[in-house]
């Protein structure tokens, strides 16, 4: 039970020594009109006092709560005014963020949380409301694996049964020790990031989006019909999973092939559902091994069947990395990249832009754009065995997103979402290449070609008229700058 009067005993802790409310003012960029920002949205949640690997006190909260925030405020108990906090580190794969204060006295009287590994059983969450004298009571029921779509990560997650809906960033307590942080959920069931992942973030990360997260290096499917065993040249009724895709990072990515039938990771046997028998949590997806059984850099043996032959391959536990897609995952804290010439607005295709069509963009966005996101999967598969992906990672899909009406672009003003192929005869692989191509017009004209299937094959702009046209457009649409790279 929590004592709200500042006194802490062996069996109870004062939440105001360890937690505080924060308020954020988030302002996302407008990816449809990339020179603008959207309206400010305020959000509230909880931050916890933690000690980093260097021994410094900071506040821990969720990345979702502080992403794209122009202002972050934390209010200590009895403080007349909130204190401004600054983002020190953020990890969107884990949904964690660290905040620091420029006030030297901010952390005086505060205490860092003590942590412990979670177990099945009763749990509680602190309440920072003077009218609520008791913490929320819940129960950790099991360990499962969740998918963090914003970064395509698979994470071991604790399931918390709780009637109330806690604030974002709330910490789960067992035996007066922190065991994890609430990520999301609905009334009755919540996902909790376990201690092991939180501690890894506190001690290993060194900057923005710096994850040392042990992670799988492949996607898999199960054989739903035993009759497929003959087709795959594996023994009938053999437990295991079929490798359907190899990632360019993570455990097994350097040795596995598409079509391999994986039966063991180390000493753990895989079921047809991808589960292992965990000594503490019972049947759970094999990703749970990356919580504490398998650490980054550790050698592990993979047992599998490949084209009918049984193999044992040794590899090292790999970590999650940004995957170098031509259509990048959701971008935070960075403005959109764009270029405007003659009213033609060029952007690089991103998930942020696709989300202009809403959360269901996979079905609502233009098909030609969605296909490039799907094609990224086969591209990753193709290049996953290459040692140097640096040059490949720089490639992007450049689109003509819209046309700002002006006399110079009459006839083109209804064009939307066309994929740029070439400009002035030069291949366009990112916005920088488009900028360079537009420095070399052909016979006084800029010729921009699009991929087949578009409403137009090409557009033509007269070079001599562009300077005056750009000045008119800049004034008419109040655009601060025509280029952001």
Residue ranges and their predicted role:
Residues 14-34, 123-127:
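A short, Trp-centered hydrophobic/proline-enriched beta-strand micro-motif
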Residues 113-136, 333-345:
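Short glycine/Trp-rich loop-beta-loop segment that forms part of the substrate-binding cleft
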Residues 136-143, 190-204, 437-438:
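Conserved, short, structured surface segments that act as functional micro-motifs
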């Amino acid at each position: 039970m929590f004592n709200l009067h500042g006194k802490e005993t062996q069996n109870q802790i004062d939440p105001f020594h360890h937690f505080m409310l924060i308020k954020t003012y988030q302002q996302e960029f407008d990816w449809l009109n990339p020179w603008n920002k959207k309206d400010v949205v305020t959000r509230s949640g909880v931050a916890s006092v933690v000690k980093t690997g260097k021994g410094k006190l900071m506040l821990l909260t969720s990345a979702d709560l502080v992403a794209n925030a122009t202002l972050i405020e934390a209010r200590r108990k009895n403080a007349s005014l909130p204190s401004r906090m600054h983002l020190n580190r953020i990890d969107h794969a884990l949904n964690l963020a660290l905040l620091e204060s420029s006030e030297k006295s901010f952390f005086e009287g505060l205490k860092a949380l003590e942590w412990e590994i979670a177990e099945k059983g009763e749990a509680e969450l602190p309440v920072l409301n003077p009218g609520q004298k008791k913490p929320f009571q819940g129960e950790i029921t099991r360990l499962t694996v969740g998918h963090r779509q914003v970064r395509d990560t698979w994470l071991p997650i604790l399931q918390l049964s709780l009637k109330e809906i806690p604030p974002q960033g709330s910490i789960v307590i067992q035996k007066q020790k922190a065991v994890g942080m609430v990520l999301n959920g609905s009334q009755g069931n919540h996902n909790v990031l376990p201690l092991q992942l939180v501690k890894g973030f506190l001690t290993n990360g060194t900057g923005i989006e710096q994850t040392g997260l042990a992670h799988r290096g492949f996607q898999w499917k199960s054989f739903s019909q035993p009759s497929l065993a003959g087709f795959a040249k594996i023994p009938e009724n053999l437990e295991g999973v079929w490798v359907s895709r190899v990632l360019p990072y993570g455990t097994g990515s350097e040795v596995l092939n598409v079509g391999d039938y994986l039966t063991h990771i180390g000493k753990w046997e895989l079921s047809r559902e991808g589960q292992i028998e965990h000594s503490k949590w019972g049947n759970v997806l094999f990703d749970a091994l990356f919580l504490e059984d398998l650490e980054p850099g550790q050698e592990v043996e993979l047992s599998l069947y490949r084209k009918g032959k049984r193999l044992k391959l040794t590899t090292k536990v790999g970590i999650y990395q940004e995957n170098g897609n031509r259509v990048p995952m959701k971008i935070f804290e960075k403005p959109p990249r764009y270029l405007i010439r003659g009213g033609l607005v060029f952007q690089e295709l991103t998930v942020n832009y696709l989300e202009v069509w809403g959360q269901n963009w996979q079905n609502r966005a233009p098909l030609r754009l969605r296909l490039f996101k799907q094609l990224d999967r086969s591209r990753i598969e193709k290049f996953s065995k290459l040692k140097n992906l640096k040059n490949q990672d720089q490639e992007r899909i450049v689109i003509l997103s819209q046309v700002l009406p002006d006399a110079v672009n009459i006839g083109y003003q209804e064009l939307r979402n066309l994929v740029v192929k070439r400009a002035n005869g030069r291949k366009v692989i990112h916005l920088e290449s488009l900028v360079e191509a537009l420095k070399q017009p052909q016979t006084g004209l800029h010729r921009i070609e699009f991929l087949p299937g578009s409403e137009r094959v090409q557009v033509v702009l007269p070079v001599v008229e562009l300077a005056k046209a750009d000045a008119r457009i800049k004034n008419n649409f109040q655009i601060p700058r025509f280029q952001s790279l």
